[in-house]
Amino acid sequence: MYFAVISIFPEMFATIREFGITGRAVAQKQVTIECINPRDYTSDNYRRIDERPYGGGPGMVMMAEPLSQAIEDARLRASQYGCRVDKAHCPVIYMSPQGQTLSESSVVDMTEYDGMIILCGRYEGIDERLLSQYVDMEISLGDYVLTGGELPAMVLMDSVIRRLPNIMGDDKSAEQDSFVDGLLDCPHYTKPHEFAGMAVPEVLLSGHHANIAQWRFRQQVERTQTRRPDLWQAFMPTVEQAKWLKALAKADKK
């Protein structure tokens, strides 16, 4: 999968290109991450990419011209990589607190793309005309504001890359994460058997796979009900999960 990131701080992306699972994916050429600096598309000696806003007000606004040229270059690079450069296969995504909140279901959908062109804003924002002309979607991490779009862009890439086939050591690891099945994840334990006076739940040591699966599902349900009642209210169980819920309810009545 191909990622082009448009940012005035390309050095920040060494974190995701060189470390951890994402770094390994880049090293093994399963993923390509290229950084494009809009300052390279300016024509003045100061390489300015921002100006004061029309109508007055605080702060600066990123200008449309250098960003548009950076996006066009990113599209060219994406096509050379083999991407179908259109909204359906390689969208231009603007990281913005005004965008649609990123979710696990949307991440899974994004794994079907050939690539992404991710636009990282700074200052007060980006000239609206650039957004109207070039941006296919805006994505937010939540109802808060950061100093720029670089960190959200890395979060987006990390979440998508780890869901691609053959990226994780075991693809089932991602399938068992929180939100994947509509519920929070269950607790996990490893050695030692006892820590700070707390022992590993005996059911996990029993070797009885059906009982372990039932225990884990119960923990998911209880955690979701307690910690994220909004998720629980929206939870739509599968046929198999509905059977588990009935079994848990029956066990609780005994």
UniProtKB/Swiss-Prot annotation:
| UniProt name for this protein | tRNA (guanine-N(1)-)-methyltransferase
Q: Which GO terms describe its cellular component?
A: cytosol
Q: Which gene encodes it?
A: trmD
The record's annotation in InterPro entries points to: Alpha/beta_knot_MTases (IPR029028), tRNA_m1G_MeTrfase_C_sf (IPR023148), tRNA_m1G_MeTrfase_TrmD (IPR002649), tRNA_m1G_MTases_N (IPR029026), tRNA_MeTrfase_TRMD/TRM10 (IPR016009)
The entry assigns this protein to a family as follows: Belongs to the RNA methyltransferase TrmD family.
HAMAP family reported in the protein's UniProt record: TrmD
Q: Which GO terms describe its molecular function?
A: tRNA (guanine(37)-N1)-methyltransferase activity
Class of enzymatic activity (EC top level)? transferase
In Gene Ontology terms, what is a biological process of this protein?
tRNA N1-guanine methylation
Query: Is Cytoplasm a UniProt keyword of this protein?
Result: yes
